[in-house]
Amino acid sequence: MAYDNSNVKPPIIDLLYPSEEQRRACLKRKAQIEQLPTEFEKDLMLAQLSEQLTPHNQYKMTAILGELCDDISVAEYRLDIIDDLLADSALTTTLRKVVDKMLVNDRTNIYKLTTPDSFTVLDTALTAFESYCECMEILHKLYEEKSSGIRSAGLKKLFDFFEGHYNSKHYKKLKAESEELRSAMTGKIRSATIGINFDENLVPISMGLVGFSDKMYEDSGTVIDRILSFGSKNNDHKVMRDLHERFDDPQSAKREEIVNNLDRALFTELDKVTKKYVNSIDDILNEYRAIGFEDMYAIEYQLDFCSGAVMMIENVRSKGLEMCRPTLLPESQRKADIKGLFDPIYFKEANVWNLSNKPQKQVVTNDITFDENAGFYLLTGANNGGKTTFVRAVGICQVMAQAGLYVPASSCEISLVDCVYTHFPKEEQVGIDASRFTTEVKEFKAISDCITNHSF
């Protein structure tokens, strides 16, 4: 049974659907389509087509393609976003990189954040928030530079979301507190004086913090300093070598443990100062959570869809072929007029082949028209002559048009359909009632029971 996910919590910003009502309608339709024969997803190789859009989130890409959206305004909404991104490569690249950086930072750093117990953890936490602020500043600057050229409602909503957070009291407080904490950390403690007790053999037996300073400690060149310096030169102005250098022994599995223990011990000894730092990090984290960054995660795969479409178009055009924005017609017109059509699956296969083989494979384009005078075609030809490739190209063109994508053709005027049905030859199977003929008759009957005047 298909899963109806139309009631799943909607994303805070949606680059796929103009409204929540349309999102629910499309997802409900997807669930209904899954009750029908859906061999078209396999026969048209939609999973491989998704790989051309993006190497990430392929399951979701295939789901969008298999949705067969029947709402022209939804498809146009997506096409408008692609037009904006296609018109400005800097907008596409910057938006994709910055959003990726924000999401990775949230997943790998901020999400795992715990109460700092060392200077290393404290610095990692603060650096994560500084990275978030840096991304917000870049997006704000990008909006100021590009806003006048943005036409699509989807990208306008996306930047309105970022600008809303940029101007919010939570972001302003987060940014100010991050800057204040960094200033305090870099200016408050630059060196610490530690008292060490030795036994009669000069073996250290205990130690404690004597004090700290906002200035670096310089080597005085005394005998005891040289003992503590572990052989460092007197003129390098260091009491001892850097901790990471001192314990940088590839044979020692305890290296990080030793350094971290020293870090934590000093952090604890400086409790009067570091407690304020910890409280500051807690305050910054609270402001970050108030911004509601978790709502950003739906943007990731939606941006993959839109920016992946742009990269696919640019790749095709760089090879001398064309992809175009389709003119979408209502189901009732039952029409398609496609010029310069090619199969994107074969296009990729040919490109891979041509990298290391001769003779080169050529991608052939074709024209086809469906209207009141031509609604059925009988395609004949020799084996390996391109029949399946051509039929697949027509099906993919229909699917991509309804997904709100540019199609693999130089021009395309096409009506929406309620479903796409395919019936490609199957391999012989072993078992009772599993002959190729029996299997194909059953599948053909399943299709004939479902088709309507608006099916393809």
Question: What are these language model-derived features?
Answer:
Residues D84-V99, F119, D225-D248, V259-K272, ...:
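Phosphate-binding glycine-rich loops and adjacent basic patches that engage nucleotide phosphates
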Residues C26, C69, C133-C135, C324, ...:
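Generic recognition of cysteine residues
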Residues M1-M207:
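Conserved amphipathic alpha-helical "coupling/scaffold" segments
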Residues Y59-Y77, V210-K254, T268, Q333, ...:
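Charged, low-complexity, helix/coiled-coil-prone segments
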Residues S332, D337-F456:
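ATPase nucleotide-binding head domains, primarily ABC-like/P-loop NTPase cores
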Residues P116-F347:
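Conserved P-loop NTPase architecture
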